[in-house]
Design a protein with these regions (language model features):
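Cytosolic covalent-transfer regions centered on His/Cys nucleophiles
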Residues: 1-149
């Protein structure tokens, strides 16, 4: 399962995108979804250097494909205060979806997940539900619809 309640954090406080990504990777590590925090962080930050994953509308989708990822995952964070993510629209980011996919995955699973997620994020009502949610449980049920689509 891509999403679980323990991979959701609300009101995350961070000063920069690297700090956000580190905190999100910590969650994945605590849930035993990745083997090495350092290796996965390096992978995600290298991808981020290629081109920012700030997709606009206050949303970022950092991601990485790495042998340190045990099984595909999504970590979700809603920030207490938006931060600069070098987004296409220059808006501060407050909703982050960190995707991780095992390197050995040959079906381009990360592209399929990105496509599903992108479709959902084009729905303003879906994004509004996420922004207005106040509990991890609420967010969990909203995000489950990604796997169903």
């Amino acid at each position: 399962m891509l999403i679980n309640r323990n991979l959701i954090v609300l009101d995350l406080e961070a000063k920069c995108k690297t700090e956000v990504i580190k905190k999100m990777i910590d969650l994945a590590y605590k849930e035993d979804r990745i083997i090495s925090k350092e290796d996965f962080l390096k992978c995600v930050l290298e991808r981020e250097e290629e081109i920012s994953t700030g997709v606009g509308n206050g949303i970022a989708i950092p991601h990485g494909k790495s042998e340190t990822v045990k099984e595909a995952l999504i970590v979700f964070a809603k920030l207490k205060n938006g931060i600069d993510w070098e987004s296409m629209d220059s808006e501060k980011v407050d909703l982050i979806f960190l995707l991780g996919v095992p390197e050995r995955n040959k079906e381009n699973l990360h592209l399929k997940i990105l496509a599903q997620l992108s479709r959902k994020l084009m729905d303003e009502d879906f994004v509004k539900l996420l922004r207005n949610s106040s509990t991890e449980e609420e967010v969990y049920y909203i995000l489950r619809s990604i796997e169903a689509s």
